[in-house]
Structure formats: C-alpha cells, structure tokens
C-alpha cells in the first residue's frame, strides 16, 4: 500500500530582487547585483502556458509540437518604497530630495528570490533568474472609520537566461531548493543570487568524541545531542560542554592541529565552528 502525505501550499515571505548585470556565454556569463528587499508579500502566484499541438501526416497525428509562454509571476505586496519602486521599474529617484520622478524609463532585468512553505512547515527557497517588472497600480482612498487599506500588485514576466549553466548545459528560469531535505547549506541563500551552478551538496565531515576516564562531557548542535554517528557540515556551530564533577580540560583537533582549552569551572560551554573532520577529547585534570 502506498503511503501518501497530503500537503498544500501555505506561506510566502522574504521577497527580494537583484539586477541582472550580464547574461551571456562569453567572459562575463551570468552576473547580478546585490539583492535588496522589495516589500512585504501577501500572495504570490506563477503561471506558465504550455501548448501542445498535434501535426498530422499520413492521415495520423504523427508529431506533437510543444511551446511555452514566459512565466507570469503575480505578487501582492505592501506599499513599495519609492526608491525601490524607481529601481525595479527603471525610473528615477533623487536621494537628495526623496523624490520619485515618473517619466521615460529604462527597463532592466531582475532576478527575484522568495521563500514558500507548505502545510507541513517545509520551506522551499526560490530564485527566479531573469525577468522584468511592470509598473504597478496604486490605489489611495480617504481614511474613514473602517479598516480598509491598499497594497500593490506586481507583475513580473520571467524568461530563461541566455547563459547556459555548466550543471545542465542549458539556460534556466528558476531554481527551487527543498530545505527540508537538508542537502545544501542555505544560510546565505539570499545574500547573493543563486543559480544551478552555485548550489552544491553539503560535504559531511566526521566527528569523533572521546571521553576521559571519569568525564561526561557532551556536544550539541541546534539543541540536539551530537554522537559519533552525527554528520557535521562546514560552518555549522557546535556547542561543547566539557563537564564533570572535577576540573576538566577539553582538547579538540581539526586536521591534526590540536588546540587545548582549559575549563577551570568544570561546566563552561565552548562554541566551535566546523572546518573539517573534528575530534573532541574530554579528559580529567588532576
């Protein structure tokens, strides 16, 4: 019998954008600017029309021709700050006066990033790699005794990059990373635009915990106990608890370089950032 878990999409947050600076297969390749916040996001939908049409030969449907439209991403957001509005719509903003100048614009391509979530609380981190924003409408109304207020609706038309990525040999429209599988490091996912070539699997390192004759020190990660069977990853933080009833020394080594830290109190916690295979040794001090 097949066991199936039913989930629905419920949650979206963290909408950011970054200008696409270059997109080619030459020296520059695919490059972008630094991501910036757009506005709070209430709802996001993506649509893509796919058309399949059969062509007839020898009195039978012999060939199917398939075509795809650009992606249309519709985003309901809070009021967009005027400087951000100018940036994403290709208009002018004067920082010295706080003035948006509406007029002839210079449209630019942007990548957008955001986080979606399902009803199981599992997040998907997304970067859409190339597209252009419309100029969103703005509705303003008088303040009355009600609670009505207006956000804005952005429409982002997404296309495929001209740049062909090494991983696939093709361009890409977007990447979607399931964080629940814990296969990649997503700590800095939105610090820069991610592509098929920048996403790589986590490299698991080993940890060896050695106890002294009467020590009972322990190691935790994210509030969970770490054992010799626990995989550890680069840049993760381990908390080392070298505790026993007497004074204890703690030694940890990485790549054969031993470092000793003396714990005179017997119960001080040390933090350690993983850099490679790690050995943590607890031993008694007379």
Segments predicted by a language model, with ranges:
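Polar/acidic, low-complexity leader/linker segments enriched in S/T/G and N/D
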Residues: 1-45
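Oligomerization/assembly interface segments of phage tail-like spikes and tubes
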Residues: 60-85, 148-161
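Short helix-loop boundary/capping segments
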Residues: 103-142
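Mixed-charge, glycine-accented linear interaction segment located at domain edges/termini
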Residues: 131, 135-202
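Conserved "repeat-terminator" motif of extracellular CCP/Sushi domains
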Residues: 204-211, 242, 264-286
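Short, solvent-exposed loop/edge segments of extracellular or virion-exposed proteins
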Residues: 206-227
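Extracellular modular ligand-binding repeats in secreted and cell-surface proteins
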Residues: 220-247, 274-276
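Surface-exposed interfaces of beta-sheet-rich extracellular modules
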Residues: 236-265
